[in-house]
Structure formats: structure tokens, C-alpha cells
Amino acid sequence: MKCICRLSECIGKWLKVSVMRRLFVWFVISVAALTSCGNKSNKLRDVDPRVESLLNEMTLDEKIGQMVLFTSDWDVTGPTMYEGYLEDIRNGRCGNIFNAYTTDYIRELQRVAVEESRLGIPLLFGYDVVHGHKTIFPVPLAESCSWDMELIRQSAGVAAAEAAASGLNWTFAPMVDISVDPRWGRVCEGAGEDPYLGSQIAAARVKGFQGNDLADTLSVLACVKHFAGYGAPIAGRDYNTVDMSERMFRDVYLPPYKAGVDAGALSVMTSFNEYDGVPATGNSYLLKDILKNQWKYQGFVVTDYTSINEMVHHGVVPDEAEASVLAVNAGVDMDLQGVVYFNYLKTMVESGKVSTRTIDEAVLRILNVKSRLGLFDNPYLYCDKEREQSIVGSMQNMQVAREVARKSMVLLKNDEVLPLKKGERIAVIGELASSKRDLLGSWKAAGEWDDMKSVLEALVAYNGASNVVYAEGCKKMGDDRSGFLSALLAAQSADKVVMVIGEDWDWSGEAASRTDLGVPGVQSDLLELVAATGKPVVVVLLNGRPLTIERESQVADAILEAWYPGSRGAEAVVDVLYGEYNPSGKLTMTFPRNVGQVPIYYYEKNTGRPIYLPNEKYKSKYLDSPNTPLYPFGYGLSYTTFEYSDLKLSSPGLKKGKSIVASVTVTNTGARYGEEIVQLYIRDLVGSVTRPVKMLKGFQKVALSPGESVQVSFVITEDMLSFWRKDMTFGAEPGDFHVMIGRSSDDTLQASFNLSRK
């Protein structure tokens, strides 16, 4: 070490550039670490020895600084709690920043951290890149309806490349919360109601964001959120209490988080809700027992916005000081914008309520992730102006967004009206038809709409201005009917009507819960009048959740669920309406008939009084509505038709540790090329605890020309039959099973097999 110190003095005489000084410090730390890292022991694998050595050089204030995440004044996604972040970066008391982007701005903040703080530890820069950065893709719920894992991975990869090119190295995504309640506004950010599909998508998005190498400048750190159970608030009201059985929690809600962690995610965000009476941000059962111990999670845990502070309101701690103790001892490594760790954690350590070992473990996790991102080798790795100008919002990325949007749309109804014919006179009605902003949905990141087309503009561009007449008709909100007459006149002058209706973008997302799931305002009243003209009416829905559209489905001739389709969503809508692309999307959330059916999902239990005959009275049913949804999970139409036949099993019995194969023939019986999502469901007929009527266990997407057939096969293993049993062990139970393969959760062929004890 004496030689190293003398070498430092000599080289220091000619090191004039601050960045070089910092790099040299890291060189010294690296050499020193080679002699000391073997004496350390911790639960993490593959810890950078420089990180362990650096930890020994840090003061308590500097350690706590690494556990602090403050917002910049660049963009705000919540109430600003603290504004002196620049001085705190200099003092080593803030190690992470969010809501900042562009290479110029981030380079300057990074310069302050690296060149003006004592140890020069680089900053993490996070942002809500939820469904794109500059190029905005369809909202995640829409993307999930593509059932296309490679496409979803690709869209996350494009988002990561653009974010990284803008200086960012961390996204607060993916949201993997399962939800069966469309009243909850944040369903638009997730993958729907199914744990198997949700797990596949969670893994695909993590891999898309993080790529093959976190230090690759086309990748960013993913953040699996919101851990855990955030998608199940009572009454669908955001931030509300979550109360469910441990079995339901483990069977349905936990799997996507586990899939994200297994895919390599190195940050996990806590949720606002409580679980089993304890807020998730202070819940050691979730954060330590499950995440860090059972799952061997290698990354760090960050809170959601001020959720440590909010534990005071939950009533589990008397003040924010005690909240800091509860959070850090439960396993929270980083405080997002709460200023609680910043204000109180040092005092709590000095008082003995928090151990230095707890602090060290948290800081070690954070610093190790920074190392994995390559920030210790090059703090400005993500600050390349040339890359920013060439990648962000490129034509190539926009084309990917258009492809994702086309594959995410779901054709809900079509009475031989679609596809439209070019040259027909089209009346376009609805305020949403002329809106660009609404196409982006919530969490638009750096997305802009100035260079986008509205659905109206895209229709004019494709069909010609002389063949399109527009009337707003009514606003998307409110009860003004003064434009109805002009809309009816426009409809009467046209061959067909395209009516664009749905939700304002701000009515979906965080803090956007609803008690009425109908189309807002008087849009549906206008639709009924337009349909009464006798002209064929095509409804295009722009929304972020399943809506109750039974009324609309009765009067419209065709309904296309376009969701919030993103930067090139308008062009994608036109592609589908005119048959340039044959729709193939399938619903990943059930569409209820009315809000009284909510929560509603396909994997319900049979109950002791299932319905066998429609008029039976003392059964589990409603007096005023069928139990069945309007549109079930897995449903979606095409411009062609597919026939399922010849379901076969390779064996009627499945032995433990072995597998059987289920196969079905799918034939394109229509006149167009099309893609079909073939779905596999399994039912466990008798269990030690009650089991769902079916659960999705596999799917495949096939592409067929007219008249073409293909045999689709699924391998069924014992693992696919496993669940949390009566004694809360995980595994399969011997017995009889139904296997169902088909085009949706309620339209399948069925066969049976038996799982033996041996």
C-alpha cells in the first residue's frame, strides 16, 4: 500500500483534468480491493471488489446519500419535496436523480457528482420510461394484447436505447401488477389479469430494457414494480388497502414479480398499499423473506414516491423518523423523494435503532448496480450527444412503434363492415378523432405530439381529403349536444362512419380510478343517433382500461379496440381499418357487461352452486345480468376465420417427472392471410383446496394463408399443474385434469388426462 500511495503522489503531479483524477482514484481503490475483498462476506454474488473497498472509505453521511433519490427540476411526476439537490450532490448526500433527461443536462449533473464531490461516486438517473421515451409505444395493457413476446422485448429495447441515448440509465418499469379490476386506472400500465401471461411479459420487458449487458449503452436498468399486490386495491381505488389470502397472493399476484427478478432485474420498487396489515414499504416479509432471501434477489429496493412518509398516514409509525427505521430494517435500500432517509437515518443509526451493517448492505447493493452499469469505468457512458441525435425518435423506431400498435389492437365486433374500401366516402366523428395528445396515453416520458398525426389526419392521408368529412359532434367530456346535428348531417352524407370515442388520456393511469366504466360524456348518446341514420358505423375505442360497452356493441356494426396506441397509433388504426394489416390481438383483460360484475376474470372458482341451467334460482348468479362477460379473456376477431379440430393427447396419463403432448389442428377457413393466438388452458378437477375453472398455461401464435392448416402442440409437464396446496407447499397433486385449447378462454376444445402418484 505504501508503493501505491507513492505512485499516487507522483502521478497526481501531472493529472490536471478532474475526470482523470477520479479515474485514478478508482484505479487505486481497485488495486487495494484485490487484497481486501476476500475478507468480506455478504449475501450478494459477483460484487465488484472496488465497491467493497469504496464502502470502507465512505462516511455515514455519504453512505446515506447513496440511499437518497431526489427529483430534479426538469420534469415532475409528483409533489416536489426538496429542491437543494445540487448542493447535496456536491456534499455526497444525494447519490441518485430522477426526472432528468437529455445528455447535456445529465452530463452537467454527473459532472458535479464526479468532479465536485469528495469520492466522485457517479449518479444513477431514473425516469418513468413506461412505454417508450421519445418514440411512444402503445400502453403496456395494449401491448400485452399482442401476445408477442419478441415484439414486446423489442419495444422495451427501443425504449431503453432512446432513454440511454438521452443520458438515462434507469427506467421505473416494467409494472407487472396483476389486476382484475378495471376501475383501477393503472391497469393500463400492466399486462392484464393472468399470472402466466403476465410473467412471460414481465420477463420479456426486463430483458428488453436490460439487454444482454447492462453496461451496453443501448440498455438501461429495469425496475420491477410495484412490490407487491398493488393491482388489487379494494374497490379499485388507487392507493387503497389490499387484503387477500396468502394462497391467492402466491398463486396469482407474485409470479410476475418473480419472473422479472429471474430475468435479471436489479431494481424493485415497493408499492403504496399494505399487505397483511403492514405497508409494503415497511414489510420485511415481502422485502426480506420473499424477495431477498427466498428469491435470492441481487439488486436494490427503491420506494415509490414518498411511500416511506406515507407509513405515518397508514398508522404503523408515529412519525417520519420511525418510518425511516421501519423501512430500512424491512429491506428498503433507497428512498425516492421522501427526504426521510436524508433527514432522519443518521440519527437513527447513532441511536442504535438501525445498525451500520444494515446501511452497508443497502449501499453495497446500490453501488454494485452502478458498477454493473459501467458507471465506475465511465461516468459519462450515457452522455453521447451524437448518439442522442441519431437514435432518439428515429424513423426506424417510429416504424417499430407502428408495428407494435397494429399488433396490439383487438377487433371486438365486425358485421362485415371492415375492412373499409379505399375511395369510399367516410364520415369521421368525435373529438378524439382529431386529438393527438390522447394517442400517447399517460406516462408519455419525452414523447411529443407535434409531429404526429391524429386519426382524422391519418384517414385523410390514406383515403384522400375529398373522401373524408369530419364533424366533432361532441366533446369527450361533458354534456354539450350542440354539435350533434352537424355530426348527423356528416353521417348522412357518407357511405360509412368512423366514430372515435373513449377516455381522455388523463382518465387512465395513476390516480385515475373510476366508479363508472362507461364511455364518458355524451359520446355514446351521439353514437346511438348516428347508428339510427342507417349508415354502417365503425367505432374506434381510445382508452386505457376495459370499458362497459354493451350499449355501444348493440348499435355499432364494428368495434376496434385501439387503446392508447402511441406515436404512430393513428397510422396503425388506418392500417387495420383498411385491411393493410389483419388484426390479431386478443384481450388480456375481461370486458364486463357492467361495473356491477367487477372484479371479473376468467379463472374464477366453480363455487358450491355453479350454474348448469339458465333459470335456476339458488345459484351463484345475478338477477339482472348474466355472469358471463361482454368480451372474455383471450377474445379477438380477425378478417379471416380459423377452425380448431382434432384435439389429441399423446397419452391419457401423465407420470410424475414426465410429460405428455397436447396437439390441435388449426385451419384458416377464410379468404385472407391471418395470424391466430392458440391458447392452452388446464383445469385441476379435484384438489386439496378449491381450484379455478381454468388457468392459462401456454400459447402460440401461428400465421396461416387461406386454406392452410397447421398442427399446434403443447408439452404438458407436472410443473404446469403446480399450485400452493393446503399445507402451503408448492407442487402438483395426483388426479384428473381437463386440457382445453382454443381461440379464447370461453371457446375451446377439451380432452382429459390423469396425473399419477408415481
Q: What does each model-identified segment do?
A:
Residues 747-751:
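Extracellular and select intracellular beta-sandwich modules with Ser/Thr-enriched
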Residues 33-723, 731-745, 757:
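Glycoside hydrolase catalytic-domain context in secreted enzymes
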Residues 1-44:
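Bacterial Sec-dependent N-terminal signal peptides
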